[in-house]
Amino acid sequence: MNLEGKVALVTGASRGIGKAIAELLAERGAKVIGTATSESGAQAISDYLGDNGKGMALNVTNPESIEAVLKAITDEFGGVDILVNNAGITRDNLLMRMKEEEWSDIMETNLTSIFRLSKAVLRGMMKKRQGRIINVGSVVGTMGNAGQANYAAAKAGVIGFTKSMAREVASRGVTVNTVAPGFIETDMTKALNDEQRTATLAQVPAGRLGDPREIASAVAFLASPEAAYITGETLHVNGGMYMI
């Protein structure tokens, strides 16, 4: 699964799953541009990628920011071959208490940004008749979760978007897929107390949380030449928590 000569853009790459994805794609030979919301975050990405890529500051909810970053990538690296839409946020609340902005912020960051970025890189991929778009979803987008109606709706939307876009661009050599993580060992899960952690693990037949590297491995496979005949799919990586 060699990615030599490919340029990969990974959003939300400063930590957790995004960082693991950026690191693994770089290990496989890709030149990786990882994004963060701040200049300091972008510098941290540049530091860990070293000669294998660089970090850039990107506001995924701002069309002008997206345009500027993609122009910079094109000028320096010649365009994007692999897009990994990983950036996302949570604004958890019960639906009865959910504020308008808690809904709209999630939709803008977790769904609309995927539309904007995917559309922005698509023309270049279609001209080359080759490209990979990989969206990071969530098990919640399929099974739902109390207190996350906004997040679940956005992640379910990612799956529908993936399937529709895949149908449109498959004949041009561009694949579009989703990787849907379950409970993964990140800063968010490390903050769980013992009771919460026990309750979480009780839902996972594998009996453990996933490692960010395991999500990265799924992404790296879908980004590879070996996955050229896979498109419109959602690859669930959740330790058996939810089986489709």
From Swiss-Prot:
Q: Which domain of life is it from?
A: Bacteria
Which GO molecular function entries does the Swiss-Prot or TrEMBL record give?
Answer: 3-oxoacyl-[acyl-carrier-protein] reductase (NADPH) activity; NAD binding; NADP binding; oxidoreductase activity, acting on the CH-OH group of donors, NAD or NADP as acceptor
Q: Can you tell me which residues bind substrate?
A: S138
Its Enzyme Commission number?
1.1.1.100
Q: Which Pfam families match?
A: adh_short_C2
**Catalysed reactions listed for this entry:** a (3R)-hydroxyacyl-[ACP] + NADP(+) = a 3-oxoacyl-[ACP] + NADPH + H(+)
List of residues binding NADP(+): G12, A13, S14, R15, T37, N59, V60, N86, Y151, A152, A153, A154, K155, I184
Q: How does it assemble?
A: Homotetramer.
Q: What is this protein called?
A: 3-oxoacyl-[acyl-carrier-protein] reductase FabG
| Organism listed in the record | Vibrio cholerae serotype O1 (strain ATCC 39315 / El Tor Inaba N16961)
